Amino acid sequence: NWNFSIQDEKEEEEDNLSEVTEDDILNMFTHVSPCKCKKERITVDMATTGEDNFVMKHWVGFHCDDIQYCMKNSNLEAVKMIKQFMVKHGLTDKELIIDVQGNGFLKEIFNLVSANGGGVAFSGAIAATAKGKKLYERFKDEAAHLATQMIKAGLITYDRQLAKMRYTHQKLKLESSTLTAEQMQFESRIFKFKRLPSGRIQFEGKKEQHALIKGFSPDLTDNIIMLCGGLCYDCYRELAGATGGEL
C-alpha cells in the first residue's frame, strides 16, 4: 500500500485499547532518565521482510540517544552497518542485543553467547526467565510486558531531538515521511495483552500486531522490547525501585 499516511489514519481513529497511550510515548521524549542502570547497549531489529525497516538504537541504561535505520539493505550491508554503529559508540559484541529469529547467521558473525562473554541473541519464542515463568508464556510476552511497565513508569527515555528526527518507510506515501515520535505513537497500539486460561499473560501475536498498525512492522518499538528482554533483571530492579515494591 503506497498510499498510506499516518495523518490519514489519525482522521479515522478507531478504539485503541493498547496499554501504552500516545501521551506515554510523548513523555519518553521529555524526561531525563531516572534509571540507575547505565549499561550501554545497542539493539538491532533486522528487516525480516521486504517492507520492514532495519533499525538500530544506542542506549545508556534505558535512555536512547541515537537511532539509525535503513529501508533497503542486504544481510551483508546490515552487518557492515552494525559494525560501523558499534565503532561509532565504542562498543563490542558483548553490548549487542540482536533479534535473531530468522537471522541465525548473525550468531556466527557476532559473539551472541552471553555465557561466553558475548551479546544477547534475542529470541521471543524461548521460555520466560526463571523470575517470569509463572506469569508469562514466552520470553517475548515477558519482554513486551516489562517494556509496557517501563514506558508507563517513565523509565524508558529518549533524547528530545530524536522526537523530531525524520522517519520514513516503504509503506508510507512516496512523498511523505513522519517524525520518530509520531511513528512510535502509531506503533504503540501493539501493546495489547490477554490473560490465558493458565493465568499467564500473552502479548499480541505478530499477525494481530500487523493488523493493528495497518500492515507495518513495529520496527521502532520492537527495539524497546528487545532492550527490556536483554536487560530484564535490570528492568525488574528499576520497576521495584520506582514503585517502592517487589516485582
Give residue spans per PLM region:
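Residue-level detector of short, conserved catalytic/binding motifs and their immediate flanks
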Residues: 39, 54, 94, 221
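Generic hydrophobic alpha-helical scaffold/packing signal
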Residues: 44, 83, 148, 224-225
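ATPase catalytic-site recognition across NTP-hydrolyzing enzymes
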Residues: 1-44, 58
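Mg2+-dependent endonuclease catalytic cores in nucleic-acid-processing enzymes, primarily RNase H-like
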Residues: 60-200, 242-247
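Short, flexible loop/turn motifs enriched in small residues
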Residues: 37, 48-55
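Acidic active-site catalytic centers that drive phospho-/nucleotidyl reactions
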Residues: 45, 99, 219-222
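Acidic two-metal-ion nuclease catalytic site recognized across multiple nuclease folds
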Residues: 3, 13-25, 68-72, 166, ...
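Conserved RNase H-like, two-metal-ion catalytic cores of nucleic-acid enzymes
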Residues: 45, 55-57, 68
